[in-house]
Regions:
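Conserved sequence signature across two-component system core domains
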Residues: 14-15, 44-46
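Short loop->beta transition adjacent to catalytic acidic/histidine clusters or analogous donor-positioning motifs
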Residues: 6-8, 29-42, 51, 64-65
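Short, well-formed alpha-helical segments that are part of the catalytic scaffolds
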Residues: 17-32
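Hydrophobic helical membrane-anchoring modules
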Residues: 1-7, 149, 173-237
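Conserved donor nucleotide-binding strand/loop of the catalytic core
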Residues: 39-42, 53-85
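Acceptor/aglycone-binding surface of glycosyltransferases and processive sugar-polymer synthases
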Residues: 70-85, 92-94, 101-179, 206-216, ...
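A conserved acidic beta->alpha catalytic loop
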Residues: 45-54, 100
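Donor nucleotide-sugar binding loop of glycosyltransferases
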Residues: 17-20, 48, 75
Length: 237
């Protein structure tokens, strides 16, 4: 195994989250410091058009934080970009979103389950979704089951711990511009028989700001993710 400097690199993609991003970063610093981990936080701003960028830049000189400001490419490509940086920094990579719908204080539950595993994937309990979003989630779960023999309960959750050595292998087959890379990663982990542990997490509706997806947008993006998943499945054994 490669000799890596850090225990974990936390990848947080962000776009137009001026009301939440500062609180999100502060919470992650608090949690990781309390666990005495050797860590790095990667904040990747995907070309925000509000005050998010200026808030993120304030953390540029903070110890254990890297801030990356890049042109807008979308959530998926931003996750992949973060993963590709993170695998060279730490033994484990953790991905979280910046909306605080899953509190960072739940990270320790996944971290303690990592021993002997290649990935620890959260699953959201009591998730209050609209009918349309519930349908999109169901289709994603069925598609990964059919294409990858994946039985994970929450294939697209942005609260996942991945061993860098394994993630590096998967990233070789997932396009840099992937629209929904986490779904493909969930499927590939299962298909290639890596050791996966699931961990329930509490999901909270966001209290400030707005979700970037309407029901119609969720349907369109769900369809796009499905076609991409079919294509990606062909490059895995």
């Amino acid at each position: 195994m490669r000799k890596l400097l850090k225990d974990v690199a936390v990848v947080i993609p962000v776009f137009n989250e001026e009301e939440l991003i500062g609180e999100c970063i502060d919470e992650w610093l608090k949690v990781l410091n309390s666990m005495n981990l050797h860590y790095e936080i990667l904040i990747i701003d995907d070309g925000s058009s509000d005050a998010t960028t200026s808030i993120v830049e304030r953390y540029g000189d903070t110890q254990n934080i890297q801030t990356i400001i890049k042109p807008n490419e979308g959530h998926g490509p931003t996750i992949v970009a973060g993963y590709k940086r993170a695998v060279d920094i730490a033994e484990w990579v953790f991905q979280a979103d910046s909306d605080n719908e899953i509190n960072p204080n739940q990270f320790s539950a996944l971290w303690t389950k990592r021993h002997g595993k290649d990935a620890v994937i959260g699953w959201r309990q009591d998730r209050n979704q609209t009918t349309v979003r519930r349908l999109v989630t169901y289709v994603a779960r069925v598609a990964t089951k059919v294409l990858f023999r994946c039985h994970l309960r929450d294939v697209n959750i942005p609260f996942r711990l991945l061993r860098s050595e394994i993630l590096t292998i998967l990233l070789e087959r997932i396009p840099s511009n992937a629209f929904a890379p986490n779904i493909a990663i969930s499927g590939a982990l299962s298909l290639m028989n890596y050791q996966i542990e699931e961990c329930p997490v509490v999901f909270n509706e966001r209290t400030v700001g707005e979700s970037s997806l309407s029901n119609l947008a969720a349907l369109r993006k769900g369809g796009r993710a499905l076609f991409e998943l079919i294509k990606i499945s062909r490059v895995f054994p």
